[in-house]
Each structure stands twice: as structure tokens, then as C-alpha cells.
A protein has these predicted regions:
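Short acidic (Asp/Glu) patches
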Residues: 50-52, 88-94, 109-113
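Internal interaction segment
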Residues: 135-163
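A short, N-terminal "cap"/entry segment at the start of jelly-roll beta-barrel domains
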Residues: 1-57, 160-202
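A short hydrophobic beta-strand segment most commonly corresponding to one strand
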Residues: 107, 121-141
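Conserved metal-binding segment of the jelly-roll/cupin
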Residues: 97-119
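Beta-rich globular "head" domains
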Residues: 61-65, 69
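A short beta-strand-loop-beta hairpin characteristic of the jelly-roll/cupin
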Residues: 68-101, 139-141
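Short coil-to-beta strand junction motifs in C2/discoidin
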Residues: 59-62, 81
Length: 202
């Protein structure tokens, strides 16, 4: 045991079940849950095919960054070959669409709405790194009730939420519950989703 073992974290390969648009594994640094007193959070993912999983606008109480590059670290520019639709705005009524088609980093200020996010075309794998500036990283989501109303739902701290499939375990964002929770009335694309929120001026 070293004196500073508490400052060193070894990544664990976490298997996921999102679908064939991702490799069967992912890596996470869950801030305080990995290194006590950490003020940083990060996930590391590869998208290999078209995908639409971030369907609802959300915000965090801390600043967040989304970094998109080509997956080949020897040439992250030359290997970027994708079209990604991303929405962001200070209010839901002001959500603005951006098309990402080259290596890009997005700064998301605290309490700024962001998403939906959709990978429309993926010619080559895309590397996404999510960076949160807090060791305990939680998400607030706007949920529509289908009757013109809404609720703001706090989905809990990452690393602390219970698994939907097995409440005895913690959620690892493995995606196993993703398909099971899909509904027929869910938006089919990012633009459709974003436009559903345009009437909410907050």
C-alpha cells in the first residue's frame, strides 16, 4: 500500500447493453465514488453507428463539457466522419440546434438546458468524452406528461442511483433498461423531441 493510493484510480471495464452502436464495454470515472473528494467526473464512450438515446433536455447544477473527436487518437481530425445533432439553450423555448461534423468541444454552463443529442450518420467511430466539474454528478430532466404538462425530475447522483432491473445494485448506466423503457409515443428524432419543449419558457 502506498501513501497516495487514494489519489490513483484504475479503470474497470464496464460492460454495457446499449446496442450494436457501441462497443460492449465503456469506462467511467465517477468522481467522488472513485476518488474521495474528487471535483471531477468523466465518461468515455465510442459510438460506431447511428444512435438516438439522449432524447430529453436536461441540465446540471455544475458546468459540463462534451468532447467529440474521431476515435483514432493518432488522427482525431482525419478520422472524424459523422453528423451529430445537438440542442442547447438557456431556456427550453430557446433551444438551438447545432450540427457537429468535425472535432468539437461544447461548454454547458450550470443550469443550461442541453440535448436531445442524435448521431445521424457515423461513417467512422466517434469518441465522446463527457466532463463534469463536480465529484457528485446529477441530472435534472424535463418530462412531458402527454397532456400539455411537465415535471422536472431529478434522476439522482450518478453512481448512487439504483439499478432499474435489480434494485439491489447501483446503476452503472449500462443501458440494459433502455429498450425496456422505450414507448411508442417517444420522439423518433432529436428535432421532433426539441420542438415538443418550445412552449415552455423556462
Amino acid at each position: 500500500m502506498g501513501r497516495y493510493d487514494n489519489l490513483v484510480h484504475t479503470f474497470r471495464k464496464q460492460y454495457n447493453h446499449w446496442g450494436d452502436f457501441m462497443p460492449p464495454y465503456q469506462a467511467y470515472f465517477r468522481g467522488h465514488d472513485c476518488l474521495p473528494d474528487s471535483s471531477f467526473y468523466s465518461s468515455y464512450r465510442c459510438y460506431m453507428k447511428e444512435a438516438f438515446i439522449d432524447k430529453e433536455p436536461n441540465f446540471h447544477s455544475e458546468e459540463e463539457y462534451l468532447c467529440f473527436t474521431g476515435y483514432d487518437m493518432l488522427d482525431p481530425w482525419g478520422t472524424f466522419d459523422a453528423d451529430i445533432e445537438f440542442w442547447i439553450g438557456e431556456k427550453l423555448s430557446k433551444l438551438e440546434k447545432h450540427i457537429i461534423n468535425k472535432p468539437t468541444i461544447v461548454r454547458i454552463p450550470p443550469f443550461f438546458w442541453h440535448c436531445p443529442l442524435q448521431y445521424h450518420r457515423v461513417g467512422k467511430p466517434v469518441y465522446l468524452q463527457v466532463l463534469g466539474t463536480r465529484g457528485k454528478f446529477g441530472t435534472y430532466v424535463c418530462r412531458l406528461d402527454g397532456k400539455g404538462g411537465y415535471s422536472i425530475e431529478y434522476t439522482g447522483l450518478s453512481g448512487q442511483k439504483k439499478c432499474v432491473m435489480d434494485p439491489e445494485k447501483k446503476c452503472t448506466v449500462c443501458g440494459k433498461c433502455y429498450r425496456a423503457r422505450e414507448k411508442a409515443e417517444d420522439p423518433k428524432n432529436a428535432t421532433e423531441s426539441a420542438l415538443r419543449y418550445r412552449s415552455f419558457d423556462f
